[in-house]
Structures are given as C-alpha cells and as structure tokens.
C-alpha cells in the first residue's frame, strides 16, 4: 500500500489510521495543557519585560499559580445578568471552543520519520485542510456576537462591533496570504505545504511580504495588542466579555489562549518549515521519531512568545487606524504578494 507516496509494510496497513489518529489525539490533549502553560509564559515574559519577578510564590517558578487560578475560577459565583438572553449567553463560550476543536482536527501537531519516510501526526488529513482551517476559524466571530448580544450590555455590544469591523478587514489579507502559499506549493493540504518547504527553503524567505501580512493579520484576528480595541479597558471595561464571570469567563479566557497557540502553529507550519529536519536527522532511527515534533513545538513556542511580547512593545491603535491599515496597506500588499507567488510558482515549476 502507498500512503502519501510512501510504501508501508502490509502488516502495518490496517493500523495506520488508528496509530495516526491516536497519537494526534494525545498531542491535541497536550496542546490543551499548553493553553494553561501559555498563561504562565505570558505572565513570566511580561514580568521580565517590565523588570518584575512575576509569579514566584506559589510553587517552583510560580508554576502552581495556574492551579490556584483554576481553583479560584471553579469556586467563583456564576452570575448571569437578569436581562440576558439565556440561550445565547450560555452557549457562546461553547460555540467558540467548538471552532477551536474543529481547527485541531485538521492541524498536524507533529510528525515522525521512520526509515526516512514522513508520517504526520494529525487527527485527520484533508486535501483542502488549509481552507477548512480558515473557514472554521472565521466562525468564531459568531460566538463573539452571541456573547455580546446575549449579554444585553452596551459595552459588550460596542466591543463586538469593533471586533466585526476589525475581523472583516483583516480576514481578507489573511486569506490572500494563505492562498499565496497554496498557489506556490500547488496544494491546499497543509501537510503538503509544510513538506514542500524542506529543511531550509522556508516560505518566510520565499514570501517575506506574505509572512508580514499573515502575521499582522493573525495578530488582529487574535485581538491581541495593538489590536485589542474590542476590549480596551479604558473605554469598554472588558468589551464583549464584560458580563461573564466564573467558569464561563474561564472558558472564554481559555479559548483566547488556545486560539493563540493554534495561530502560532499555523505560522510555524506555513512559513517556518514546520517539522522539516535535515536528511541525516530524518534517517536516524531515534532522532527521526523525536526531532520533527520537537522542532515544530520549538518554533511554535518562539512564535507564541513573539505574540506575547508584542503586547508590551507597541501601543494600542485607534479603531479607525486599524481599519485603514487593513484596507489601505495590508490588502494591496497581500495582492502584490499573491502576484509574486504566482510568478515564483510558475518559475519553480518550470
């Protein structure tokens, strides 16, 4: 049997889907634990930037602070506004987490090399996985609308309107940047896009403009500084999450950090070579099992730390500046990059 152009011994054939799916699910569970780790990383990194200690009293390096925060969230009173729409208010966090679950189905979270052959670790493999990821990530906005409208609060609704304006403007260049990578590779499968980059010919070098456009648009999609106009504390209290407390707030908070981690994975897979390692590593019996996933996770953590560090490096933009930048700067740059990708793809294909 041939699997992804790889010859697989016949006795393994019946177990290939189960092995990949099981390992993929285990890594997906590990990524959820990574959502908690991302909170600790942000606290420590922010403290380092501000010349503070950060969490240091609860356990070694403050690691048990996460447990303390979880206990606090579990024990806080869950207050629902009296005039809220119960169905929309209660189900908005679940809707947002569902979007993240669907993204995790298609994103490969690692890979192994056995006898030099590549075996990506993903729950499933889709020929149009990159379009699927883009589509299900965009439906997160409906969860935000449900939370804002269901809260029946003016600050929540104003925060959601700002979120709509920002996401409409930045989803377009984000999508074009993804299409540019797919056009040059000749595939909509994120596994093929990652594998095509090889060990050193990463898309960040072939499409530097596309990388800049994608990263800025991703930051806007995440709603991180300088693009957090939807929850600017000085103007809108907490934006569309103003009325959320207890575990419902915890779910929204967790979804935000999970979105950050998945966005970091996409940057690493699409532009930074993903799991690709030199041939001598791939052909090594031990390193081929460990190094690819380790390299991908290292790149993901570095991207995550960059996103977190941006919070303290740049000031918040006004909402009109954000909208102007998307339509007047990023959109033309993304179209220019698309033309470059088409030409480069034709040249490399020739």
UniProtKB/Swiss-Prot annotation:
Question: Where does this protein come from, organism-wise?
Answer: Methanosarcina mazei (strain ATCC BAA-159 / DSM 3647 / Goe1 / Go1 / JCM 11833 / OCM 88) (Methanosarcina frisia)
Q: What is this protein called?
A: F(420)H(2) dehydrogenase subunit H
Q: Which InterPro entries match?
A: F420H2_dehydrogenase_H, NADH_UbQ_OxRdtase_su1/FPO, NADH_UbQ_OxRdtase_su1_CS
Single GO cellular component annotation?
A: plasma membrane
User: What does the organism's lineage look like at the top?
Assistant: Archaea, Methanobacteriati, Methanobacteriota, Stenosarchaea group, Methanomicrobia
Assembly notes: The FPO complex is composed of at least 13 different subunits. FpoA, FpoH, FpoJ, FpoK, FpoL, FpoM and FpoN proteins constitute the membrane sector of the complex.
Task: Look at the named UniProt entry and state the broad enzyme category this protein falls under.
Answer: oxidoreductase
NCBIfam families on file: F420_dehyd_FpoH, PRK06076.1-2
Q: Which Pfam families match?
A: NADHdh
């Amino acid at each position: 049997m041939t699997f992804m152009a790889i010859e697989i011994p016949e006795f393994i054939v019946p177990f290939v889907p189960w092995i990949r799916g099981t390992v993929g699910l285990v890594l997906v569970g590990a990524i959820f634990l990574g959502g908690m780790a991302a909170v600790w990383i942000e606290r420590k990194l922010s403290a380092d930037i501000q010349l503070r200690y950060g969490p240091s009293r609860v356990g070694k390096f403050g690691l048990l602070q996460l447990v303390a925060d979880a206990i606090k969230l579990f024990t806080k009173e869950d207050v629902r506004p009296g005039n809220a729409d119960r169905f929309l208010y209660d189900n908005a966090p679940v809707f947002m987490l569902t979007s993240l679950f669907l993204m995790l189905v298609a994103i490969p979270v690692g890979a192994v090399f056995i006898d030099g052959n590549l075996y990506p670790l993903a729950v499933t493999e889709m020929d149009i996985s990159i379009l699927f990821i883009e589509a299900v990530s965009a439906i997160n906005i409906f969860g935000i609308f449900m939370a804002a409208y269901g809260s029946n609060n003016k600050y929540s609704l104003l925060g959601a309107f700002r979120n709509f304006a920002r996401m409409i403007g930045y989803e377009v260049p984000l999508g074009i940047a993804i299409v540019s990578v797919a056009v040059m590779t000749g595939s909509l499968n994120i596994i093929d896009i990652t594998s095509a980059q090889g060990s050193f010919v990463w898309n960040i070098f072939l499409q530097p403009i596309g990388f800049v456009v994608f990263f800025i648009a991703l930051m806007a999609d995440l709603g991180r500084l300088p693009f957090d106009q939807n929850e600017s504390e000085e103007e809108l209290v907490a934006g569309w999450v103003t009325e959320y407390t207890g575990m419902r707030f915890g779910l929204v908070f967790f979804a935000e950090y999970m979105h950050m981690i998945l966005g970091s994975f996409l940057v690493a897979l699409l532009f930074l070579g993903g799991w690709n390692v030199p041939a001598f590593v791939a052909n090594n019996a031990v390193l081929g099992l460990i190094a690819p996933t380790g390299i991908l996770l290292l790149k993901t953590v570095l991207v995550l730390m960059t996103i977190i560090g941006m919070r303290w490096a740049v000031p918040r933009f006004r909402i009109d500046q954000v909208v102007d930048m998307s339509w007047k700067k990023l959109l033309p740059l993304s179209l220019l990059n698309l033309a470059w990708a088409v030409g480069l793809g034709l040249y490399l294909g020739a």
